[in-house]
Amino acid sequence: VMYTAGSLAMAYGYDYEKAMIAGLLHDCAKCLPTEKKISLCEKNDILVSKVERENPGLLHAKAGMVLAEEAYGVKDPQILHAIKVHTTGEPDMNTLDKIIYIADYIEPLRCEAPHLSIIRQIAFSDLNQCMAEILYDTLHYLSGRKGSVDPTTQLTYQFYEPYGKDQPWKH
C-alpha cells in the first residue's frame, strides 16, 4: 500500500512522502486484539459504534490513528486522518484520504476484488470516480454477506455516487 500510495501521490501532484507514511502505517493496528483496539479508542474519546463492535475488523483504522501517533510519533493531522478513514471512508474526503483508501483497494497483492483491473486504471485518472466505483463494488459485496454495513460507508457512497460512470457490471 505504501508504494501504491506514493505512486498515486506523484500522479496527482501530492506530497508522496506523506502518502507513503500513511500507506505504511494504515494497518498498524490491524493485528491488535479486539479489546485492545476498543480500549485505544475509548481512552482517546473515539466513538466505537454498534456496527464496529459487531465487525471489529473495522476498528483497526481508528485504533491505527491512535497507534500511529502514540507509538510511531506521527503528528501530521492529514496522515492521521487518512489512517482513520481508510476502511469506511467518509463523505468529501481530502486528497490524501482518497489516495490511502484507493491504494489499500488496488495494491498489487490484492487479486480478488471485482473489476480490479479497470478500477486500477481509473485510480490514476480520476480519484472521485475511483472512489465511486470502489464503494459501489464494496457495498454490493457486503450486501451479500451476513452482518451490517457501516452507515459511514453508505454515506460515503452517496457522496461519491454522482462521480461514478455507467459500467457494464452495474446492469
Where do the language-model regions lie?
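Divalent metal-dependent catalytic cores for phosphoryl transfer on phosphate-bearing substrates
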Residues: 6, 11-133
